[in-house]
Amino acid sequence: MVTVDLHELNLKPNDVVLDAGCGLGRHLRQLARVPGLKIFGIDKSTGALRETSKSMETMPDAQSKDYLVSIADINKLPFADASFDCVICSEVLEHIPDHKKALKEMDRILKPQGTLVVSVPRYFAERICWFISRDYYNEEGGHIRIYKKKQLREMLTGQGFQCWKINYKHALHSPYWWLKCLVGLKNEENFLVKYYKKFLEWDIMKKPRPVRMLEEFLNPIMGKSIVYYLRKG
């Protein structure tokens, strides 16, 4: 499941790209399919990084082999000033107590006119989850805030970024999380949850055109994520 549209980023050979909070590497694998990039991924989870390294090593269609994944704190990034052409931060800020410090760090390491892409859960879809289930927002390491569209945009532009595009993604995933909140987040045996998950996995693997068209239609209405495309300076 990819949240960031890489074709929007105009990446070129020798561009240096960071996925800040890379998790299991979903965006790193997409970046590796772009020829000639220098790719970095950081996360706080050693287990996730281990899985990411394995998946990157075994990619049969990788066009960029110059990559490094390592453990690091997004509030204290181990990189020099102005060292990246692009930074991706997808579904991370909602987990971080000091999210403003994280933004300052990403601003610091970006080159002038560099690209920042930030995605977070969309207010409407997330608010429903919080309303249905206390466990959803009380889970350790989970989401600690909900962003409104204007609120986050103003925070990003207040840091000096220029926002040139906003879009929405993963509309078909919103009902899945509402269902999980209704039946219990850890209840994987519920009939509806089990088969909806299989449907989503099938969609991710097969990408059937009618389902892709349906989600594109629904994204502005009930997209699970909101994505901000920004330029530094």
Where are the model-predicted features located?
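Alpha/beta-hydrolase-fold catalytic nucleophile elbow
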Residues: 119-120, 169
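Short, glycine-/aromatic-enriched active-site segment of Class I SAM-dependent methyltransferases
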Residues: 121-145, 154-155
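A SAM-dependent methyltransferase catalytic signature shared across enzymes that methylate proteins
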Residues: 150-167
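Conserved catalytic loop of SAM-dependent methyltransferase domains
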Residues: 165-201, 224-225
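A short glycine-rich, Lys/Arg-flanked "PGG" loop and its adjoining helix->strand segment in the class I
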Residues: 100-115
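Residues lining the SAM
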Residues: 90-93, 119
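Conserved N-terminal segment of class I S-adenosyl-L-methionine
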Residues: 1-80, 86-90, 100-103, 190-227
